[in-house]
Amino acid sequence: MARCGRLRAGTAAKLRRWRKGHSSDCNPETRRHRLAARSRFYSRPTEKSNLTVDAVKLHNELQSGSLRVERPSGSSQLPMEEGDAGEAATERSSGTFLSGLSDCTNVTFSRVQRFWESNSAAHKEICAVLAAVTDVIRSQGGKETETEYFAALMTTLEAVDSPESVAAVAYLLNLVLKRVPSPVLIKKFSDASKAFMNIISSQACSGSTSALRWVLSCLATLLRKQDLAAWSYPVTLQVYHGLLSFCVHTKPKVRKAAQHGVCSVLRGSEFMFGDEAPEHHPAAPSSAKFCVQEIEKAGGTKEATTTLHVLALLRDLLPCFPAAVLKTCCETLLRVMTLSHVLVTACAMQAFHSLFSAQPRTSCLPAELNAQIITALYDYVPSANDLQPLLTWLTTMERAHVNLGRLQKDLCWAHLPRLFSATMNCFLSPHLQVVAAAAQTLETLLNECIAPHMDELGNVSASTPAPGSYLCKMFRSVEEGLTYRFHAAWDGVLQVLEVFFEVCGKQCHPIMRKCLQSLCDLRLSPHFPYTTEVDQAVGAAVGAMGPEVLLEAVPLQIDGKEETLDFPRSWLLPVLRDYVQGARLGFFTSYFLPLAATLKSRALEFAQAGKSLESKIYDTLQWQVWTLLPGFCTRPTDVVEAFKGLARTLGMAISERPDLRPTVCQALRTLIHHGCGTDAERAEVGRFAKNFLPILFNVYSQPEEDGGSSSQRRSVLDTVRAYLTITDPQLGCGFLQKASEKLTSPESSEFARLSILDLVVAMSPYANEQALGSLYRTIQPSLQSKDHSMQKKAYRVLEEVCAAPHAPCQAFVHSHLEELQAVLLDSLKSAASPAKRPRLKCLFHIMKQLSAEHEPFVTALVPEVILCTKEVSVGARKNAFMLLVEMGHAFIRFGPTPQEAMERFLLLVYAGLTGSVTMISCTVLALTRLFFEFRDHMELNVVEQLLQNICLLLGSRTRDVVKAALGFIKVVLLLVDTTLLAKHVQTMLEAVGSLSDDMRRHFRMKLRNLFTKFIRKFGFELVQGLLPAEFHKVLVNIRKAEARSRKQRALRQAAAEAEEEEAPAQPKGDSMEEILADSEEEEEEEEERRRGKVRKKQARQKGQAWLKEGEEDEPLNFLDPNVSQRVLATEPSLKKSRGVKHDFQVSEDGRLIIHDEEEEVDNDEAKGVEEEVADVLQEVGLRSKKSQKRRFREEPDDDEPETGTYSQYRAGGSGIHRPLDKKPAFGAEYRSKKGKGDVKKKGQLDPYAYIPLNRAKLNKRKQAKMQGQFKGLMKGAQRGAKAGRKNRLKDRRP
């Protein structure tokens, strides 16, 4: 029990105490509720009102008419002369105080109209001024043009006195001035500038900055609109200098507005974009002089605030200055960088960077001045340990050299060797960012400064004079990076070498041979970690120099006469295979073919001697040599000269070497597609078609035992198709005639006839019309054949002929159109299931050529096409849907209108609803696809009738029909607008609600999916009210799932926002659109104030600098020209944290967001737009259902059933089979089977280490003991995590 009269311990500090002398006060200080209550009884307000004297004065003047819209004289020149507003009669209306705002017709003030709900006094003042000005313009018969608003606002600006009203008027003027015609502003420049300057002088020392900011912006816009002649008057420059003086103002917003205005004047004045624009703005020299004077005036003050402000201004203005004053500014920047003030140096470097990035004209930045700046910047190289300054220096030097290369290539190349040498020193930096930036800098310089001019050079050697000698020096600097002292950055060095080889390898290979040898030796060193990077670099050398140069520098050291089986450079073969292109085909014939023959003979010798291992090694080597052939056939340089010497060997390899057949066929296809760029090359390769095609025909016609596996036969057939594209048409027709003869020959076996038909399919698109007529008569009996394979391939021939774009094929189809229609109709019932896919494709191509007179033919096809939408073959179903859509397009072509045509077509399809159960389900599928494709051509009554018919079908007792009907409703729900669908929602839900119990159980997932979409579209209450009670439980579950999904998304979004780091400051825009764009950020004043303290703290931290002492006990020499490198922006005592950075997602309140691996998220709960589209595509047959995906992720044959009827069991495969080769997850034995988290198991260790919560352990005397226990636990956990990490790394290694 607590003592009477005393408070409980710990509460005294929480009580609020009276101030001395105020213990008798009983009324609270906060009177918010009293004031709210008083306002309801019409009492006079006692708080400060927004009604000011200036507002009343403005109101009285507006109402009395003394304040009139000032129209500029000489209105015949201006767009403001229509009507005489002075004589217009006015009439008081019952408009409200904001009538002029809410119905303002000028789009200039559309931004202001969102202020009327704001609680900000400044926003309310702006709205009041705009409403009053609009009212007075209307009262005088104005048309609310920008010029009228400008005149009224300028008059208002002179009439108001308070800073708030001045700020409001200036804000509106800032908006309207940008749209006022230039002649108006030129004519009124004197009056307007005088008014602005008076306000600026009166508001310069004011505590509020809003009025000053907007007036400065208005002044900048006014100056920007003046013509070139106006800038010859002293008054214009005087006004401009007034604006310029505020660029060093102490208030940040005022300074920002002035700097933005100065930039817009110098870079965006209208006369700068005319045909007779001057090279630079007339005010540019005086602006440069002002900046130099301000910097010199600031001198070496400690904070250098003014200097920083001027440097920020120069960052945007340097590209606008003429060359003479630009040189003075650059000299001033270099002098101020000697102060070793970290922020000043950084801002000066940013100014140089913006100068070079802007790529100014030669009149602004001559090449000589650019080169002088580059030379001077070498005196300001930061320390290798200073991260951010070094990155800035590298980027600036990169832009400087790129700009110099644009101005004068020779001068740029002369300066590049020194930069390469300095940049290579950055590879010794301990910071990975510096190493990556250095590598990126060198790669950019090579690509932008060197690569465009390499074609002008010949071969470069060590004795080549300039400019080739510069390349030698640059390459020597990079090559030095392969020494051991750069070993920590070898990956970056190898990337630079790769780019060097790509850019300069063709011309500079004589000086690169030693480097290639070093790379190959380096790769053979034990435990070398960068073998992939070496392979890429050597591959780049192969692509640029060619394999001949590489093998001269680095011999393959394989000749078939080795005494040992050690082939140290065999790794070159895969590199050559992946990177060789554009090489001489003759080199492969002269070097690699004899080598492959020698290796093959050596393999045979070892096989005969019983040495299987040696035989296998040499056989693999010769196979690797042959795999180089496709690369040599990619854009070879000597096809015409070299192919004839290689053709015979390739033909023998195809016919006699099944193991080489795929490689040789691939090489031939590559040569045809990517090596025959000219007519001469195509003619040379096509000349050997009479030799290659018979060989390929014979190989393909052989059974699989002799002709190879199915993949090899497919490769041979693809090669035949490729070769036919460059074969003489007469020769192709001869081969086609011979194939037709063998096809009808009784001596041909069934396999031979099927193979010949495959070849005929490949040859038919290239035949002439006479050969096609003969071929058609040959295959016509096969169209009625009972052999399904023959029938299918016969239809494939027709498909290729109908789809071919060549003139003979199109002429044949056009001349035989009636006959083809009759044949395809007669075979309606006799067509086998495998033949339906190509048969439907034939009909698809024929349908495109039909006209209105062929409508009976289309009508006769409708039932068959509808039934084919549920064929077993995936390809047949796909083609049936395509044909159905094409038939719809044909009816639209038939006319008379698309709506009537679709109505006639749907009537034909509706007939299927009266057929069998299968026909009904197929018809519903067809209607779903037709609605998806042609909903824009369907009348509203047609859609309503269609929907009613489908709803009736939901009462069917057949699952297939109900399934198809549910799919149609889903498509309608996703595609039709909510307003059109609202009057049918009751019909649809009543039809769905009337499903039988069996149907409801069977389609429970489909119904859940459908109800989710209904709830998302129409709301929970409406759907629940229209469905029977047995569905309510499902609806409640859906609502809970949707709410849970929304909550999880919100948590994920909050965690993602919490993880986002503060974005780095973006550089100011270089384009004129960005400079002249309105800044929305200026309106967020309160937010800026809140951020101010944080910025000041960061600025103080950034402004700190550290001085690096001399080595050992050596005193620091301040007269050393390199002393600036010892001024660091990074605290040297701070060491980089080596802790492991976790990537856990955290919500706003600090909770970890943990996702279980087995946690299944309902697809419909998290579905976005893409998932909804996927649902529609599945229902209309454009995408396979998720439940019907292929089990083995292979490309199936079109005629295989999609449901996997013929697939065989494979243990550990995909689908429902468990992954046998996957290791169990670590800790899986502790995982709970029902709930989440881990559970304890009897006889096993605890799944986690923990300290039990115990109140007794809060005793301070036992604090040291508890800390020791916790530290031991943490150390043990860290050791275990370290060991686990090592084990995971071992498991990942091959």
UniProtKB/Swiss-Prot annotation:
Residues 1091-1100, 1282-1294 have a biased composition (Basic residues). InterPro entries: ARM-like (IPR011989), ARM-type_fold (IPR016024), RRP12 (IPR052087), RRP12-like_dom (IPR012978). It is found in: Nucleus, Nucleolus; Nucleus membrane. GO terms for molecular function: RNA binding. GO terms for cellular component: nuclear membrane; nucleolus. Residues 66-92, 1049-1144, 1178-1225, 1255-1294 are annotated as: Disordered. It is a single-pass membrane protein. The chain crosses the membrane at residues 905-925. Residues 1072-1087 have a biased composition (Acidic residues). Keywords: Membrane, Nucleus, Transmembrane, Transmembrane helix. Belongs to the RRP12 family. This is RRP12-like protein. The lineage of its organism: Eukaryota, Metazoa, Chordata, Craniata, Vertebrata.
